[in-house]
Amino acid sequence: MRTYSGRGHLNLGGEESPDENARLASGVPGLDALMGGGFSKGRIVLVLGEPGTGKTIFCSQFLHGGAVGRGEKGIFIGMNEPKVKFLGEMKALGMDLTALENDGKFSYVDASDVKHIPEQAKVGRIPVGGRELGLVNLLDTIQEAVDKTKPDRIAIDSISDLIFRYPALEDRRPVILDIVETLQATGATCLMTSELLSTSQDRTLQPEEYLAEGVVILKMLRKGTRTIQVLKLRGSKMDTKPRPYLIGDNGIEVLSSEEVYE
């Protein structure tokens, strides 16, 4: 098991600089028009949103689209709900991830135990901080899944339960940085979701927004009205205006040419 330095520096080796000209389709209809054709290959993108905005669906479409459209392998690292429930909900939206799993194009990794580790735990007889052990377990889980699958796309849903165990914002930064560096070392294009803490126009940026290479914000303006905004996407031309989106029978669809009226 690796050790956690608390400084945000893990050297896994094998990193390659992303090709900023290479694009991966997001799998979300209408979204690529806001991002110059898709996500930059090999980048780490944060998807921030309130509950009910479709973060899990967003990640699933990203992985499903890569597998069906391009034959790419994807890993979903779930920290919130059981695999059976997740697969059933996504199948109801037209994404048969079980079939893709049988074809070797999709893997579900259950990392929910990370958030259940007590504040004080033990490795053998040695007492360790539960928060730190949770992080180490997550990073090991990611690396083991990558070594086994060699994925092109990875999604983690969500990192909130882990990082919110650190009340002080300055303590969260090295945790997030370790997650980001671990994902960067895989060479895959990665999404990680987190809870949006404030929807106000003058909100304070969350630590994970500074460390990710791309940021997509999902908001609920009022009942039935949702907006998506590409806030940051390194190496890409962006439409940064909030745009409306729908969650229908086939998942998320971005209305990229429509304005948002509050």
State what each model feature region is:
Residues R2-P18, D239-E262:
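C-terminal regions of RecA-like/P-loop NTPase motor modules
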Residues K73, K105, K150-R153, A185-T193:
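Loop/turn-to-beta-strand initiation segments
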Residues S26-G38:
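Pre-Walker A adenine-sensing motif
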Residues E50-R125:
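Conserved P-loop
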